[in-house]
């Protein structure tokens, strides 16, 4: 490991999140111009938007088993290359099908980043800082979305502006690759693959030369590493079942509470309550800025409040905001007061999501799976998250036509409150606990210990 600061490691380790956010957010503005220049029908527009989601499902599915075998850092470098190729391929696409293929390739990198980075950051960070460090991923995602909104607005006056919008992502992709050349490998992976001295060196840097902490962590990792790498049978086995339920549940609830539909369709919502198109786009940028600020605050407090308490507070705030917003939208026609109430409620909803469910879901799926299948487990949870994202995004326009904006958001609000039951019943607390302690608790609960599992394939 080259001599680099912990800040450098955390920044470049999380940088893939910026590409994740940018590449999922930029299409909301670019599609307006792509549709006109390529003369796309409704189903073709839907495919341009959804191709990244399809690629993300594939990328997340592939990356988990691969990262357990080849390491987190190598796969992060590969993701950067795929980001770069996908961005330039999208920008230079001459026709519809080339664009779709490029967007699927890009989506594979997005899915890989979502499955890989939370695990990588969780395995690098000391237990007392893991929540803060892991939530940097979500901060980068929100920063990427904001950058996409600004880029969309900046190039909206150019005929070929959409090519610049899509191609701009190649710049941070190149930076991620260059930074990744210097990043260390995950110490957990290094111990598991027999590189003990290198793992100790990485932990020494990340723990700021606290030898007591380093020795304890090395011993704990070695104990977990005795267990042979597991596969799909262990992922669905008795011991991992509590982790799997948490991962799947958090991944689904984060999407079905309406977060991405609100973010993707915010300009449409603004125009529905009386904003002009230009004002709606500027308001979208304003929401993006607010989003980043709130997420930054969440990063600062992530290790000071229990994870379960954070998401439950978020669910209550989001649910109430959606109820208020739906009522405001029902009466927004011709009523400036109702329109203002709807916009305020929308902003409050996004604030609660950005401070709670946005970062905490990614933090926790990087924590709850045992070392020997952590990559596979995180990958599976990410696949579920992207699948739920795709289903919600594809069904939103039809549900909107059928129920209307107000009634639909009441439904999302009910799901917010349903998530509280799930968190209270199924989720265990992980704050200020080492990854090995979390794993030991799982094994104790299910009656399986390291000695038993180290002899099973």
UniProtKB/Swiss-Prot annotation:
It comes from the Bacteria. Its main location: membrane. This is D-xylose transporter. It comes from Levilactobacillus brevis. The chain crosses the membrane at residues 14-34, 46-66, 81-101, 104-124, 131-151, 164-184, 244-264, 281-301, 309-329, 338-358, 380-400, 402-422. The keyword RNA-binding does not apply. GO terms for molecular function: symporter activity. NCBIfam families: SP. Induction: By D-xylose.
């Amino acid at each position: 490991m080259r001599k680099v600061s912990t800040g450098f490691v955390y920044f470049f380790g999380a940088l893939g999140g910026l590409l994740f956010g940018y590449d999922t957010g930029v299409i909301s503005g670019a599609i307006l111009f792509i549709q006109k220049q390529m003369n796309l029908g409704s189903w073709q527009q839907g495919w341009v938007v959804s191709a990244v989601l399809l690629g993300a499902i594939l990328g997340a599915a592939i990356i988990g088993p691969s990262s357990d075998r080849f390491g987190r850092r190598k796969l992060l470098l590969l993701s950067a290359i795929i980001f770069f190729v996908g961005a330039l391929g999208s920008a230079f696409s001459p026709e519809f099908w080339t664009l779709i293929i490029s967007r699927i390739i890009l989506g594979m990198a997005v899915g890989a980043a979502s499955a890989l980075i939370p695990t990588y950051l969780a395995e690098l960070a000391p237990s007392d800082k893991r929540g803060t460090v892991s939530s940097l991923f979500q901060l980068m995602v929100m920063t990427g979305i904001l950058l996409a909104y600004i880029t969309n607005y900046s190039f909206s006056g150019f005929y070929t502006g959409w090519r610049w919008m899509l191609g701009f992502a190649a710049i941070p992709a190149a930076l991620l690759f260059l930074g990744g050349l210097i990043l260390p490998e995950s110490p957990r992976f290094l111990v598991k693959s027999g590189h003990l001295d290198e793992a100790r060196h990485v932990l020494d840097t990340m723990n700021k030369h606290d030898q007591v902490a380093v020795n304890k962590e090395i011993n704990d990792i070695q104990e977990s590493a005795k267990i042979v790498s597991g596969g799909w049978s262990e992922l669905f086995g008795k011991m991992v079942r509590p982790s799997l339920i948490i991962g799947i549940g958090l991944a689904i609830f984060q999407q079905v509470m309406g977060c991405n539909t609100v973010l993707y369709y915010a300009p449409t919502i603004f125009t529905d309550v009386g904003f002009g198109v230009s004002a709606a786009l500027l308001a979208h940028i304003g929401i993006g800025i607010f989003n980043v600020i709130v997420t930054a605050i969440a990063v600062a407090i992530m290790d000071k409040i229990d994870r379960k308490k954070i998401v439950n507070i978020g669910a209550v705030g989001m649910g109430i905001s959606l109820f208020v917003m739906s009522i405001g939208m029902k009466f927004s026609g011709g009523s400036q007061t109702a329109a203002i109430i709807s916009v305020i409620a929308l902003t409050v909803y996004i604030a609660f999501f950005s401070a709670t469910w946005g970062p905490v879901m990614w933090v926790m799926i990087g924590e709850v799976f045992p070392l020997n299948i952590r990559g596979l487990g995180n990958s599976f949870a990410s696949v579920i998250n992207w699948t739920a994202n795709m289903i919600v995004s594809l069904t939103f326009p039809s549900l909107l036509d059928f129920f209307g904006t107000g009634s639909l958001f009441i439904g999302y609000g009910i799901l917010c409150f349903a998530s509280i039951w799930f968190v209270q019943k199924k989720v265990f607390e992980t704050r200020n606990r080492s990854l090995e302690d979390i794993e030991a608790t799982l094994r104790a609960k299910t009656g399986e210990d390291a000695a038993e599992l180290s002899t099973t394939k």
